């Protein structure tokens, strides 16, 4: 996913940490 839902607006920080790639999806599942 290239765009994050409004509910995950604060994911900007984890994206910086994970790099915002495949790990982005994993983070969504872990913190959904």
UniProtKB/Swiss-Prot annotation:
Coiled coil, from the record: none
The entry's keywords: ATP synthesis, Hydrogen ion transport, Ion transport, Membrane, Mitochondrion, Mitochondrion inner membrane, Transport
Gene Ontology cellular-component terms listed: mitochondrial inner membrane
Keyword match Acyltransferase: no
Compartment(s) where it occurs, according to its Swiss-Prot or TrEMBL record: Mitochondrion; Mitochondrion inner membrane
Keyword field contains Transport: yes
Broad class of the protein's primary localization: mitochondrion
Gene Ontology biological process terms, A to Z: ATP biosynthetic process; proton transmembrane transport
Highest taxon listed in the record's lineage: Eukaryota
Signal peptide: none
Subunit and interaction comment: F-type ATPases have 2 components, CF(1) - the catalytic core - and CF(0) - the membrane proton channel. CF(1) has five subunits: alpha(3), beta(3), gamma(1), delta(1), epsilon(1). CF(0) has three main subunits: a, b and c.
Family membership noted in the UniProt record: Belongs to the ATPase delta chain family.
Free-text function comment from the UniProt entry: Mitochondrial membrane ATP synthase (F(1)F(0) ATP synthase or Complex V) produces ATP from ADP in the presence of a proton gradient across the membrane which is generated by electron transport complexes of the respiratory chain. F-type ATPases consist of two structural domains, F(1) - containing the extramembraneous catalytic core and F(0) - containing the membrane proton channel, linked together by a central stalk and a peripheral stalk. During catalysis, ATP synthesis in the catalytic domain of F(1) is coupled via a rotary mechanism of the central stalk subunits to proton translocation.
Protein name: ATP synthase subunit O, mitochondrial
């Amino acid at each position: 996913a290239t765009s994050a839902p409004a509910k995950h607006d604060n994911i900007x920080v984890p994206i910086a940490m994970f790099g915002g790639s495949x790990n982005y999806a994993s983070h969504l599942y872990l913190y959904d």
